[in-house]
């Protein structure tokens, strides 16, 4: 988003299912800000160590150095207030405290760019993204490709594991599915069983 100028802060939200390019889009915007010689700071939650401990990493392996925080509140304690652009990846691991932090940063004149899942593995709104969508100035909704039928996918399908709301995983535990192919929760039929059944059918 390039229409806001001057010392006015704002919030941009990039949301969608896993494998839809959210982190990739976040990195792209942050790199553009760096090219524009803006002071940029990047944060990610400590729980997200799937690909790197101290980098934002997209599923396509784009990388950017980031600070690691245990909570959203830690961002305000660690940020250099001279920064002009603040990026936050994996917002769902930050908790609802991120809403107040993002508001405070934007109110202080910063461009805040946040990426995260908008729905959980049950297909329900996944905090804090819904509230950030209501408060933000710019929203980008990304779609993935359904691995079953090839249609646009808006859901993150959990394939195995527990019923806990937050379970960190990648392609070994999740896949993108469209509205028709999505099964809230953990599906009874595994992907291997699905492929076998398709071949036999």
Language-model features and meaning:
Residues 1-81, 120-131, 141-144, 160, ...:
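Conserved P-loop
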Residues 34, 106-107:
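Anion (oxyanion) recognition and catalysis
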Residues 81-85, 91:
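Short acidic/histidine-rich motifs immediately flanking catalytic phosphotransfer sites
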Residues 87, 111-118:
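Structural recognition of the conserved hydrophobic beta-strand(s) that form the central parallel beta-sheet
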Residues 90-105, 121-126:
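Conserved ATPase-coupling elements of RecA-like P-loop NTPase cores
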Residues 136:
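Short basic (Lys/Arg) and small-residue
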Residues 143-163:
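A charged, well-structured terminal subsegment
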